[in-house]
């Protein structure tokens, strides 16, 4: 299913919850642009500035943050599959 949403997934190297989300997306053929806060200081600053906290995984949907791996997966199932 195509989406008209602007999406960005914020992750961190070694984060098990990020891996869970990324595995779900890959298993379902869904590609979302990623920003890794471990290697990209600008991504980390954006995550904090817009989302208000340094928590990953975080899916920005049209500029609004969605936290928690289970919530991100549920949103993807509903809107992207």
PLM feature segments, named:
Residues 1-30:
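Local sequence-structure signature of Cys/Sec-based thiol-disulfide redox active-site neighborhoods
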Residues 2-3, 45-48:
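Short secondary-structure transition/capping segments
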Residues 76:
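Hydrophobic "lid"/C-terminal helical patch
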């Amino acid at each position: 299913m195509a989406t008209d949403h602007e999406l960005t997934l914020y992750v961190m190297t070694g984060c098990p919850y990020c891996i869970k989300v990324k595995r779900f997306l890959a298993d379902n053929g869904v590609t979302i642009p990623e920003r890794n806060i471990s290697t990209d200081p600008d991504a980390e600053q954006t995550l904090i500035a817009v989302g208000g906290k340094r928590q990953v995984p975080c899916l920005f949907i049209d500029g609004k943050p969605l936290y928690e791996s289970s919530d991100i997966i549920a949103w993807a199932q509903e809107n992207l599959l």
